[in-house]
């Protein structure tokens, strides 16, 4: 049996996605091998997570120091030069970052927080669907001025879960009377936006339909 501190750390690391007890134990013993300075550096960075907030509109993360405590919006949502008629829906923040890297998308985003598998009710409940509808209907309430979304882009992975999610969103959002499009050609079936190269993503954005 490991000492209590080590055991507790293993249990905490085991809660990370795709990390089991054995991998978690390797993490812990790696930390024990590095210098005290490196461990303290890691501890400091983790402690600074308390300064990370979620954007009140799109749920992207940002540090409170970025806004000087004046706003609850991320850098993208605060940018007045963005096209406020376009809203791109993504599963997670890493997908948003991948699209931003293309420098081909001028609009705003909303992070749904997951996907649905075969339209299971328990999956649907975990998504930010109510928050999404509220923000499309009344963006001003969440800090976005001069915003009127005309097109909603569904940017999800071309997987079974991604397709099911887009199908469900099309059905739910239809009543809002907005143009709804999907990413176009280029992304391989079963692939993930997070790992797509910039040229492929750019092509998919430009050929959306």
What are these model-derived regions, one by one?
Residues 2-11, 15, 23-96:
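Cys/His-rich Zn2+-binding cysteine-cluster or related metal-binding knuckle/ribbon modules and their
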Residues 7-11, 25-29, 40, 44, ...:
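Solvent-exposed alpha-helical segments within well-ordered globular domains of core cellular machineries
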Residues 12, 16, 34, 49-52, ...:
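Conserved, well-folded catalytic cores of nucleic-acid-processing
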Residues 17, 36, 48, 64, ...:
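Conserved phosphate/pyrophosphate-binding and hydrolysis machinery centered on Walker-type P-loop NTPases
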Residues 29, 74, 87, 93-96, ...:
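Generic secondary-structure boundary/loop-capping signal
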């Amino acid at each position: 049996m490991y000492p209590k501190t080590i055991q507790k750390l293993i249990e905490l690391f085991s809660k990370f996605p795709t990390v089991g007890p054995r991998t978690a134990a390797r993490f812990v013993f790696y930390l024990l091998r590095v210098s005290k300075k490196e461990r303290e550096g890691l501890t400091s960075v983790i402690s600074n997570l308390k300064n990370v907030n979620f954007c009140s509109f799109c749920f992207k993360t940002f540090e409170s120091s970025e806004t000087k405590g004046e706003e609850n919006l991320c850098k993208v949502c605060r940018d007045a030069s963005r096209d406020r008629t376009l809203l791109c829906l993504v599963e997670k923040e890493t997908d948003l970052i991948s699209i931003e890297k293309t420098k081909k998308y001028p609009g705003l985003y909303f992070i749904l927080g997951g996907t649905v598998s075969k339209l299971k009710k328990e999956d649907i409940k975990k998504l930010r669907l109510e928050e999404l509808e509220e923000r499309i209907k009344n963006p001003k309430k969440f800090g976005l001025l001069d915003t009127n979304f005309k097109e909603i882009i569904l940017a999800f992975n071309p997987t079974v879960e991604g397709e099911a999610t887009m199908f469900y969103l099309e059905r739910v959002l239809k009543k809002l009377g907005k143009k709804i499009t999907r990413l176009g050609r280029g992304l391989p079936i079963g692939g993930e936006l997070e790992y797509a190269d910039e040229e492929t993503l750019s092509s998919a954005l430009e050929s959306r339909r």
